[in-house]
A protein has these predicted regions:
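N-terminal export signals and maturation junctions of secreted/periplasmic proteins
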Residues: 29-99
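Secretory targeting and sorting signals
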Residues: 1-31
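Catalytic glycan-binding domains that act on GlcNAc-containing polysaccharides
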Residues: 71-73, 78-261
Length: 261
């Protein structure tokens, strides 16, 4: 960690993206390691774009984010990393769009992929699949946040509209948002006219916006850790996401060539 990153962490936003405040909440089982410290920020990478990214004319919507990265690049990196190509298209499209709208954030696709792996195994947890349109089916819904040991206590905030539970909130979708966070940050990455936490493009873009709001500059150790801590305060979680994010852009992979900030 840099000296700045070793300072006491800034206060975490009151509403976290992930399922719990006290424990690991992703559907995937994180690697456990005693005596951890906050990690250094993994290298942040951008994919090869399908075409030069240009801002739309005023009042014109962005294209669906799944088409923003180069198709051949997606195929090669999906094959190398094992990330489902449709999920990878969502991560990379979100990173490319945020690079245009918030270039100071420095968010790489690999950080989104690291979170997606830990939270839901890229939308494949419990035999779920990512459909060609980006919908994850069956829907991935976490356990009730009822204050059980290691879990936050979050009474229902959405009448069960997103998570099917009118008593307790649950994290939902491939990026595992709690309903209150989704209500605040929801994005329409698929350009369908609605935001859906179970649609990968919407979920990935929402995660990108949330991370940038929480960490500001994700190329710095402090900014990256602050962003991921906003998703989940567990040090094991943060280290697990960092390890996956760095693995996905290993130097001998096609994703590492001339695509960094």
């Amino acid at each position: 960690m840099t000296q700045a990153a070793s300072r006491r962490r800034r206060a975490v936003p009151a509403v976290l993206a992930g399922a719990a405040l006290l424990a690991l909440t992703g559907c995937a089982e994180p690697r456990q390691a005693p005596g951890l410290e906050y990690p250094s920020a993994p290298a942040q990478r951008l994919p090869e774009a399908a075409a030069p990214a240009e801002a739309p004319a005023p009042g014109q919507p962005w294209a669906p984010i799944a088409g923003l990265a180069d198709e051949q690049w997606l195929e090669a990196v999906a094959d190398r990393t094992g990330i489902p190509q449709r999920a990878l298209a969502a991560y990379t499209g979100a990173a490319l769009l945020v690079e245009q709208t918030r270039p100071e954030c420095g968010l790489g696709w690999n950080t989104l992929a690291g979170i997606g792996q830990v939270e839901s195994q890229h939308g494949t947890y419990a035999d779920a699949q990512v459909q060609p349109d980006g919908q994850v089916a069956p829907a991935i819904i976490g356990i009730p946040l009822d204050g059980s040991p290691g879990l936050a206590e979050i009474p229902d905030t959405d009448g069960g509209a997103l998570d099917g539970d009118a008593e307790w909130d649950r994290a939902v979708g491939p990026m595992q948002f709690i309903p209150a966070t989704w209500e605040l940050y929801a994005q329409d990455g698929s350009r369908s006219g609605a935001s859906d936490p179970h649609q990968f493009d919407d979920a990935a873009l929402t995660a990108a916006v949330y991370l940038c709001e929480s960490g500001e500059d994700l190329t710095s150790d402090e900014g990256w850790v602050d962003a991921v801590v906003a998703y989940n305060q567990s040090m094991e979680y943060v280290n697990d996401v960092a390890a996956h994010a760095q693995d996905y852009v290993s130097p001998d992979g096609p994703s590492a060539a001339d695509s960094s900030y």
